[in-house]
């Protein structure tokens, strides 16, 4: 049995708007999983962002890679094991069967309100 590896992702990501900050809170901060297992990452907005939510993956020394936009639409070339769901204030990124290349940092970003 393979030793668990860690998925790390940002606890907090926020973008300000003209009426106040929208705070994006991700949980859990770390997730210990093994290849082949399912990983579920959550993101909560402090106010509704409709479906204007994106998920990114970042590996050391690389730029962030867009995985999901519109809360549930996979970007071009993203494998079907990645799926997004949710709307309003509650969102989820699911990786159905983790591959070794999936161990990375994951971010959610709202784009409903911009500075």
Curated annotation (Swiss-Prot):
Residues 77-108 are annotated as: Framework-3. It holds the Pfam family V-set. The keyword Disulfide bond applies. Disulfide bonds join 43-108. Residues 21-43 are annotated as: Framework-1. It is found in: Secreted; Cell membrane. SUPFAM superfamilies: Immunoglobulin (SSF48726). Immunoglobulins are composed of two identical heavy chains and two identical light chains; disulfide-linked. This is Immunoglobulin kappa variable 3-15. It comes from Homo sapiens.
